[in-house]
Design a protein with these regions (language model features):
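Cytosolic, long alpha-helical scaffolding segments
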Residues: 1-177
Length: 177
């Protein structure tokens, strides 16, 4: 499972930290744990989305209407794109692409925020199936949380890989948390 793989990777990275000079290990230890926490937060968000959707399906669900599907599709695509950008940066150590990925995270966060506010307004009007609307709102909120966790992961990975003197750090630290 993904959780088992994450634990295995974490163990290997901890063993690697033991082989590094103490000063470097201490400096990077915090960033290492923050990146692990970000990954755990993402898994938890995905589980929360899955649980809500699964429960909705198990209870003779009313499907999401075409308007909501059309609204969410570009957000989903944007989230997938950001995930792929972050994956590439971390996988290949391409930290020069970090500012662009950070901007993409901020744009995605704003887009999810706009969508969340619109959905909350629709819920308040009482139109539509309230259960479906709440499941949709949950999807939006958890997707937005995924973007926030990705931003935190980027920051932690940058610090872990390049140290605190990185020129990219000022970009990441200046963002709203």
């Amino acid at each position: 499972s993904m959780r088992t793989e994450l634990k295995s990777t974490r163990r290997k990275e901890m063993m690697g930290l033991r082989r590094v000079k103490t000063a470097a290990a201490l400096e990077r230890n915090t960033w290492f744990h923050l990146s692990v926490n970000s990954c755990e937060e993402m898994l938890y968000s995905l589980r929360r989305v899955n649980d809500a959707c699964q429960e909705h399906i198990d209870n003779n669900f009313v499907p999401l209407d075409a308007e909501r599907r059309k609204e969410f599709a570009p957000l989903r695509d944007k989230l997938n794109s950001v995930f792929n950008q972050v994956k590439t940066i971390i996988e290949y150590g391409d930290y020069a692409s970090l500012p662009a990925a950070h901007r993409a995270c901020i744009e995605a966060d704003k887009a999810f925020s706009i969508c969340r506010h619109a959905e909350m307004s629709r819920i308040q009007t009482g139109m539509g199936n309230i259960t479906t609307e709440y499941v949709y709102l949950n999807m939006i909120q958890e997707s937005q949380q995924l973007v926030i966790s990705l931003r935190h992961l980027l920051r932690a990975a940058d610090h872990f890989a390049t140290g605190l003197s990185s020129s990219n750090s000022s970009i990441l630290l200046s963002s709203t948390e």
